[in-house]
Amino acid sequence: MEKVTAIVLAAGQGKRMKSSVSKQYMLLKDKPVLYYSLKAFENSLVTDIIVVVGNDEISYVKEEIIKPYGFRKVTHVVEGGSERYLSVLNGLNKIKDSDYVLVHDGARPLIKTNTINTVISEVEEKKACIVGVASKDTVKISTHDGIIDSTPDRNQVYTIQTPQAFEYSILREAYDNLASYQGAMITDDAMIVECLNRYPIYLVQGEYTNIKITTPEDLIFAEAILREHQDFI
């Protein structure tokens, strides 16, 4: 059986939440936000989980989240970096023998186990795939001065989520070439793989409920979704 490792990122500062508590540790229906994504991966076909956390949070996550909720697939809890991609790199450096890697934002608590399993099935066939949903809005491209430059075809515009999945060797190669991407605004793992310009990345249909907790309003939305969909709990 092929080994699939999930890297769950929980090192974000969450400055837009206007709270002293990191967003991934805020309570959502009496449980930490991070609990929900870890539960989804624990129940999935993933073999093991690496959790990447902020400075001085390793002990807290182990004692207050992983042990109490019995997340047995978590093999490592490591400290993150100053940027998202550096946190992923720290997680990658703990992997010894995986065939595939899924990277997920811990601030996306409403990821479904079925979606994770679909991504695993797709990446085993296609080597690189990311979860996304079709844009509901018209998207405009603007200049730095705020002037509208163009309007892409909405049928080709997707809002990208996580998890993002890759054959381990591909993601490792991409991160080994990080030095050549200096100056690039790297916002997800697909961008780093895109820079290799050798591997097609396929879309996997996601769920509009797979929101990222970024602002206080997002917690309200997530709670409303949980009330309607008990399978997340």
UniProtKB/Swiss-Prot annotation:
The keyword Flavoprotein does not apply. InterPro entries: IspD, IspD/TarI, IspD/TarI_cytidylyltransf_bact, ISPD_synthase_CS, Nucleotide-diphossugar_trans. Pathway: Isoprenoid biosynthesis; isopentenyl diphosphate biosynthesis via DXP pathway; isopentenyl diphosphate from 1-deoxy-D-xylulose 5-phosphate: step 2/6. The record marks R154, K212 as: Positions MEP for the nucleophilic attack. Keywords: Isoprene biosynthesis, Nucleotidyltransferase, Transferase. One of its GO terms (biological process) is isopentenyl diphosphate biosynthetic process, methylerythritol 4-phosphate pathway. SUPFAM superfamilies: Nucleotide-diphospho-sugar transferases. It comes from Lachnoclostridium phytofermentans (strain ATCC 700394 / DSM 18823 / ISDg) (Clostridium phytofermentans). This is 2-C-methyl-D-erythritol 4-phosphate cytidylyltransferase. Catalyzes the formation of 4-diphosphocytidyl-2-C-methyl-D-erythritol from CTP and 2-C-methyl-D-erythritol 4-phosphate (MEP). The record marks R16, K23 as: Transition state stabilizer.
